[in-house]
Each structure stands twice: as structure tokens, then as C-alpha cells.
């Protein structure tokens, strides 16, 4: 089961060009970080998490290059990255 989740998380098929940050998150991130950013296979990204204390450049670098067992998501363009990070920040601020 965990192997399948990791496999699916690593499938960088890329969201549609005009996808919202939430859509990008649900397609590429929620499989490991859960729909509410609470963590699972991957670490918690929600309010009060280590990720919430990092700056946007760190998140962009981590998403683009991967980290540890997290795959890289090189197919995201700068606008998709901005929307994804803005969505994560919005949820972290709730």
C-alpha cells in the first residue's frame, strides 16, 4: 500500500496549465501529505508545521527538486508553483 502511494506520488504527469493551487495540490501532493496538509506518508504541511515556518523559496526549491523520498516535480511552471504555494499558505493560515 505504501509503495503504491509513493509510486502514485511520483507520477509527475503535471496538472493542467490553468489548474488552481488546490487542484495542483490534490493531484500531486495530497497522496502523501493528505488532503488537509496533515501529513501521512509525507510530513505535515499544515498550520504549525515545520513547512509553515519555511519561506516560499524553500518550498519552491523542495517541490522542484524533491527531498529525501519526495520526488521532484519539474513539470510545474513558475505560475503553477506560485498557485500551489499560495494554496498551501492559505490553508496554513486558517
Residue ranges of each PLM-predicted region?
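The canonical Cys-X-X-Cys-His
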Residues: 21-35, 84, 88
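Bacterial N-terminal signal peptides
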Residues: 1-9
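Bacterial signal peptide processing site
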Residues: 11-14
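Gly/Gly-Pro-rich "capping" loops immediately C-terminal to redox-active cysteine motifs
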Residues: 18-22, 26, 38-62
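Axial heme c-ligation environment in periplasmic c-type cytochrome domains
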Residues: 40-48, 62-94
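Solvent-exposed, well-ordered amphipathic alpha-helical segments
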Residues: 9, 22, 53, 89-92
Amino acid at each position: 500500500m505504501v509503495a503504491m502511494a509513493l509510486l502514485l506520488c511520483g507520477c509527475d504527469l503535471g496538472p493542467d496549465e490553468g489548474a488552481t493551487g488546490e487542484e495542483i495540490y490534490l493531484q500531486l501532493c495530497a497522496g502523501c501529505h493528505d488532503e488537509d496538509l496533515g501529513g501521512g506518508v509525507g510530513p505535515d504541511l499544515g498550520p504549525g508545521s515545520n513547512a509553515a515556518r519555511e519561506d516560499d523559496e524553500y518550498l519552491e526549491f523542495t517541490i522542484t527538486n524533491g527531498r529525501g523520498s519526495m520526488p521532484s516535480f519539474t513539470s510545474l511552471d513558475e505560475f503553477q508553483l506560485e498557485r500551489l504555494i499560495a494554496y498551501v499558505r492559505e490553508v496554513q493560515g486558517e
